Amino acid sequence: MSKAPSVVLAGGGTAGHINPMLAIAREIRRIEPEANILTLGTKDKMEAQLVPEAGFDIEFIPRVAFPRSLSLNALTFFPRFAKAISQTRKILKDANADVVVGVGGYVCPPAYLAAFFSRIPVVIHEANAKPGLANKLGGPLAKFVGVAFSNTPFPRAKLVGMPMKDEIAHLNRRAARAQARHTLGLDPDKPVLIVTGGSLGAQSLNNAVAENITNFKDWGFQVLHITGKGKAIVDDSGEPVTAPNYRQIEFSHGMQDVYAAADLLIVRAGAATVSEVAAVGVPAIFVPLPFGNGEQSLNARSLVMAEAALLIEDKKMTGAWFAREIPSLMADAQKLKEMGRRAYKLGIRDAAHAMAEATLKVVK
């Protein structure tokens, strides 16, 4: 490579797009320390904070959503979209971009087309088992497409896994368990069930846990309940509920601690979560979102079919189901161990490296 490569990464809107993008960026920087790395995002989404915090530059382009019905927005879509493409072409020119890497989200369609019109190669990573619209549109333009799941229907795609933080990809759960439980305020010697619906929480999970709080003292294990911001379970006086063998927090800053501490995890089935569960080998029960296009159930399919995880529909995640199923599963240490072993066997831990190498190969 005669000069330091200039890489522009596009993605954002949700952590499911931002975290893989940052993992790829970090690995490119590790392989090519002199690489010029720029990201594209929108001002009003979380990438505006998370990308600079991670040490990368970001340029903003307008958020132009594809119209799904006839409206004023639909009538003005094409001029707004054309403007976003034009602005992105200028950014790519100013950055002397050698390649554009897209991970999905609103910024990707104008980025893909700007790259195409500027004769800059495109690399794509698709996180979900059911591809998003942005990446489906960009796929025919891409020199390389990496996917996180083997059942992703994407032409010419290569299975690479989900780019993730090194702290998670290379987590040794057994070695980290005691410290992780201490960090999370848990008894290091008692089995741990962790229930989390992510940063925003999940009502079905929160309700199922809340209905069983008084039972936990008799079940022989402790429960860490990550409720989501503003979703604490409160008593009649408005104070967060406390009970034997039960601890609740609104969020955790380090999912690696959650994965290390848990003997069993009850969680949504986002692409990153499913991939991380497999990478670290933690037994899990997935409760897919009850809306959307069904991608969360598809994300979890390979682990569930391999008996590495369980899946329950959101509407069936009730307090009664929880009380009927969870105590016996938590008491079956051998089954949990086997679930974790099978999950780990399916995990892919070098996705960031695979995507970084594919990106730099396109530049050469």
Task: Annotate each predicted stretch with a short phrase.
Residues 87-100, 108-123, 136-141:
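Glycosyltransferases and closely related glycan-assembly transferases
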Residues 45-46, 50, 54, 176-267, ...:
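Donor-nucleotide binding loops and adjacent catalytic segments primarily
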Residues 57, 116-178, 183:
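Active-site-proximal region of nucleotide-activated glycan assembly enzymes
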Residues 118, 260-262, 278-287, 306:
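Conserved donor-binding/catalytic loop of nucleotide-activated donor transferases
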Residues 335-349:
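A short, well-ordered alpha-helix in the C-terminal region of glycosyltransferases
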Residues 348-364:
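C-terminal alpha-helical cap of glycosyltransferases
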Residues 4-12, 34-80, 85, 313-315:
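Conserved nucleotide-sugar phosphate-binding/catalytic loop shared by glycosyltransferases and other
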Residues 17-28:
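Short amphipathic alpha-helix
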